[in-house]
Amino acid sequence: MVKRYAVILAAGQGTRMKSKQYKVLHPVCGKPMVQHVVDQVLQLGIEKLITVVGFGAEQVKAQLGDQSEYAFQQEQLGTAHAVMQAAPYLQEKDGVTLVVCGDTPLITAETMQALLDHHLATNAKATILTAVADNPAGYGRIVRDAHGNVEKIVEHKDASEQERAIKEINTGTYCFDNKSLFEALTHVSNNNAQGEYYLTDVIEILKSNGSIISAYKAPSFEETIGVNDRVALAEAEKIMRERICRKHMMNGVTIIDPAHTYISAEVRIGRDTVIYPGTVIEGKTVIGEDCTIGPNSEIKDCWIGNGTTIRHSVAHDSEIGNDVTIGPFAHIRPSSKIDDEVRIGNFVEVKKSTFGKGSKASHLSYIGDAEVGVNVNLGCGSITVNYDGKNKHITKIEDGAFIGCNANLIAPVTVGKGAYVAAGSTITDDVPENALSIARARQVNKENYVDRLSIKKNS
């Protein structure tokens, strides 16, 4: 098998993005653009991957880690100059090299594999990934000879009227015979208006040497889109989102309105789960089977079991079990663990807390830094008072306890197994097992008191 290498061009500053963030690190469906490219390239059996970095190099390295080796482009002097930075790693090697831009997040492993196969089948020294564009203005045109081989690439500004009518364009992705690539790079000149070294000149050099230059058409233009500004970023996000939703639907997930459902690239969802509109599912969230999510819910980096319902709610960085009901308008904050058959109702906030199986907080409660046992009932308005102005403290509510409405549990405190806390109580001391704790003033009724007031209501 021919050895395969890849060079990803990720050194451009991306000034048109008008952003402090390095261009290729802008996310598309929750994943940086360059990570999308790397994930696809690594599916091709690549022996060595070189990412060319420049501005923002350390951020790119932090993102990709040991998935790639790195070449540094001190000055951005053109695409050929960028590829040349990979010479110390690759120039003496036999095989083929893919050159891919780090700002093309929609390119797929399938298309790059087809490009490789076509390159080898045609015995070419260079193969260009092309695409057919409805509006090719601004792109270099692919001019082919009678045999279908590439005769030349003509930039839009230099093209004749006949050449401008060509809709097949250069996408900036290539496959080269590796040694031929690096030999040709030594002959590239910057004798042009921009004073830069262009990778397209390699095509002309190889062609002039009598080498075969081939081209492979991508199945769609959208797959080759380069993201250079926020408009293109939004377009890439839209296309990627459609792909992701389609993949989940083909795997047995019902998405009521894909156009208004936002699922990140690394999310996993089980079959027969239903996703309603306005739902955002991000990070590395895993959702089981037979769940109902949404409408208008936000879930990030959660693990969710089977048969769970989350409506009009937010959940982050938490574990939620089977047959749980959350919402509407609940907030599950990070580091919470909700066991099976728990009910977290409307306007309940849970933060860094555990709920045992079958427990309920049905409405209007704050449960923070708490350990809630099995089959606990937290009445309306229950509050774990966890903060003393300096430190957070833990509340423990053991199995089978019953917390009445509008009860304040002042942490650190423990409510024992089967204990009851009367409605309206403020609990500052531990409650023993099976005890009833009442911590409120006794009701006093003053007969005819209103008649003795100096100021009476007007009738």
From Swiss-Prot:
Q: What PROSITE patterns does the entry give?
A: HEXAPEP_TRANSFERASES
Record-listed E.C. numbers: 2.7.7.23, 2.3.1.157
| Record's keyword annotation contains NADP | no
* Residues reported to bind acetyl-CoA: 386-387, 423, 440
The segment annotated Linker runs over: 231-251
NCBIfam families assigned to the protein according to its UniProt record, in alphabetical order:
glmU, PRK14354.1
What Pfam families is this protein classified in?
Hexapep (PF00132), NTP_transferase (PF00483)
Which residues catalyse the reaction?
Answer: 363 (proton acceptor)
Q: Name one GO biological process term.
A: regulation of cell shape
Which reaction is catalysed here?
A: alpha-D-glucosamine 1-phosphate + acetyl-CoA = N-acetyl-alpha-D-glucosamine 1-phosphate + CoA + H(+); N-acetyl-alpha-D-glucosamine 1-phosphate + UTP + H(+) = UDP-N-acetyl-alpha-D-glucosamine + diphosphate
Role, per record: Catalyzes the last two sequential reactions in the de novo biosynthetic pathway for UDP-N-acetylglucosamine (UDP-GlcNAc). The C-terminal domain catalyzes the transfer of acetyl group from acetyl coenzyme A to glucosamine-1-phosphate (GlcN-1-P) to produce N-acetylglucosamine-1-phosphate (GlcNAc-1-P), which is converted into UDP-GlcNAc by the transfer of uridine 5-monophosphate (from uridine 5-triphosphate), a reaction catalyzed by the N-terminal domain.
Pathway as given in its UniProt record: Nucleotide-sugar biosynthesis; UDP-N-acetyl-alpha-D-glucosamine biosynthesis; N-acetyl-alpha-D-glucosamine 1-phosphate from alpha-D-glucosamine 6-phosphate (route II): step 2/2; Nucleotide-sugar biosynthesis; UDP-N-acetyl-alpha-D-glucosamine biosynthesis; UDP-N-acetyl-alpha-D-glucosamine from N-acetyl-alpha-D-glucosamine 1-phosphate: step 1/1; Bacterial outer membrane biogenesis; LPS lipid A biosynthesis
Q: Where in the cell is it found?
A: Cytoplasm
List residues binding UDP-N-acetyl-alpha-D-glucosamine. 9-12, 23, 73, 78-79, 140, 155, 170, 228, 333, 351, 366, 377
Annotated positions binding Mg(2+): 103, 228
Name any cofactors this protein relies on.
Mg(2+)
| Subunit relationships | Homotrimer.
Provide the protein name.
Answer: Bifunctional protein GlmU
- Lineage summary: Bacteria, Bacillati, Bacillota, Bacilli, Bacillales
Similarity field: In the N-terminal section; belongs to the N-acetylglucosamine-1-phosphate uridyltransferase family.
Region annotation (N-acetyltransferase) ranges: 252-459
Q: Which residues form the signal peptide?
A: none
What gene is this protein a product of? glmU
The Gene Ontology terms for molecular function here are: glucosamine-1-phosphate N-acetyltransferase activity; magnesium ion binding; UDP-N-acetylglucosamine diphosphorylase activity
Print the keywords alphabetically.
Acyltransferase, Cell shape, Cell wall biogenesis/degradation, Cytoplasm, Magnesium, Metal-binding, Multifunctional enzyme, Nucleotidyltransferase, Peptidoglycan synthesis, Repeat, Transferase
- What does the entry's cofactor note say about binding and number? Binds 1 Mg(2+) ion per subunit.
